Amino acid sequence: MTRSAKKGPFIDAHLLKKVEAAAGGKDKKPIKTWSRRSTILPDFIGLTIAVHNGRQHVPVYVTENMVGHKLGEFALTRTFKGHAADKKAKR
């Protein structure tokens, strides 16, 4: 179930403050955040946000197509090593 339209998109207040400060300045350092649940707003376009994936901060460069999605969608938490090879096929 999606979020109600009258509530608006969710974004952590501390992240919004950092984004507004970065948009005004010319500093291109990534914004470090643990807030994977925050929705990407149009103000984020062109910024690099370092999203925590449980182990490290993954840099995510925000583009126009990402608006409306959550930050956590772009910082994967699980590494897929591949399925086990079929032993019969090796012979």
From Swiss-Prot:
PROSITE patterns membership: RIBOSOMAL_S19
Protein name: Small ribosomal subunit protein uS19
Keyword terms: Ribonucleoprotein, Ribosomal protein, RNA-binding, rRNA-binding
Family: Belongs to the universal ribosomal protein uS19 family.
HAMAP family: Ribosomal_uS19
Claim: Ribonucleoprotein is one of the keywords in the record: yes
Source domain of life: Bacteria
InterPro entries: Ribosomal_uS19, Ribosomal_uS19_bac-type, Ribosomal_uS19_CS, Ribosomal_uS19_SF
GO biological process: ribosomal small subunit assembly; translation
Function: Protein S19 forms a complex with S13 that binds strongly to the 16S ribosomal RNA.
GO molecular function terms noted in the UniProt entry: rRNA binding; structural constituent of ribosome
Listed GO CC annotations: cytoplasm; small ribosomal subunit
